[in-house]
Amino acid sequence: MAFNSQEIIQDVRAEFEHLLDFVTGEQARTAKADSIERGLFKMLLSLGAKLLQLFFAMRSEACSRQPVQSKSGQELPYHRDTERVYFSIFNKVIIERPYFYEKGVGAQIPLDAELGLGDDSYSDLLREITEYLAVYHVYGGKNADFLDRLFGFSLSTRALQQNVAEDAESVAAYYAQKPPPCPESEAEILVIQADGKGIPMVLEEDEVAEAQVRLGKGQKHGHKKEAIVTTIYTITAAPRTPTEVIASFFKENPPKKRLKKDAKPQNKHIWATLDGKDAALSRLTKQVALREGAHILHRVALCDGCEALQARIVLQFQGFLLILDFVHANEYLWDAANSLLGETSEQRLEWVKSRTLQILSGQTVQVIAELRRMAKNKKTKVAQRKQLTKTASYFERNLPYMDYPTYLSNGFPIASGVIEGACRHFVKDRLELSGMRWLQTGAENLLRLRAVAENEDWDAYYAYRRAQRQLRLYGQSVSNRQPLEAQAINSQPVLQSLVGSGHPKHSQLPLAV
């Protein structure tokens, strides 16, 4: 199929005239805004397909058919034009390219390199849009419906999974070469956090062979594997009193005067892996090394009561002050209160608040003693005794990491809200939806791209990946010139103002510059 640029130009002009008539013609005078907007969008997609086809046709016509040199320096004559499909947001478009070939020497298609094409049919923009959706929503179902409603087509679940797998391959390499944040953008306290979250897994082949044909009551086809989520950031010291923490934590009226706004994490970097605690913390040590410097005055490690994680953190991060996450400590008090007073008792809140204040004020030993006294009381039921003892033992084991008065006076963070939110949002909200079961490779791929998105590295990562692909496929480096889409937007003040006023997080969407 031969495409003539002049014929396409005529079609484009005719279609554009049709667009003008659609918004200025007789029917537009009585049309509803909704019908015009919907019609315009579909027509613009159609026009976009023709314009993209015109671009490829003109590039093909301008491409020389004179012999080219192979990598070995031998001459490759023009053989014929060959076609490839370019699957874009405007649907599929055909690209005709001159094909140079000599038997026994090899083949080349120079236009592929000039256009920066990948080794499959999907356009980079289509990949980025669909993968961004896949990072936050299930592969099929509503995700596919959204694409179909927006563009008039969708990708299969298998195609999406394959694209995610391919585009996740370079994430580790990207972060290995990414420079650390500049010291001027950092705060004085370097904070690391680690926590685990279970992901439902399908049985691997060797496990399937050993599985029962018929499961017993309560058994499931699969199991959970722990993903270790790590976070590193810096934060400004924010001294506060136990009373202020209680007021904030229990949503009481805050003090009338606040000397400064709540400190916010700076340059937060999040990561999750199914490769185990050692692999996760080993990577975290490298991140710590990148963030170190004279600007860092204090180092804090926040963790829940997981003994395995605590032991590794103490060993691998010896310059860090390990702090037991205050939220986890408080949860143990709630467990004790529920067991002792009943889950519907109105007395629970005051009981928990008073003992939380004791813990924050450095009286954890007294709380432990009280819990053990109640556990030994003859009137205490067996279940209550078990929970009270469990809570007391948890506090006793973690006493070295519960010097909250010192932490608060120094302005250190005592709650791992960042990592708790990450476990819920980063892992659970995407990988633990109803009915989901994962293979480790599939879950790992998705976790890597979710990290790219959550770390607000989406645009930079995909630019890096395109550059690496150009080098791998064609041995060429990518120009540092301003992208054409940026030039187009910068030449239009209205578009520039729209892009510039966007929400920072949304600026990383594939359509943004």
Protein language model features and the residues they cover:
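Catalytic center-proximal scaffold of phosphoryl-transfer enzymes
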Residues: M1-A57, R97-V513
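An N-terminal low-complexity regulatory-tail signal and nearby short nucleic-acid-interaction modules
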Residues: F56-D119
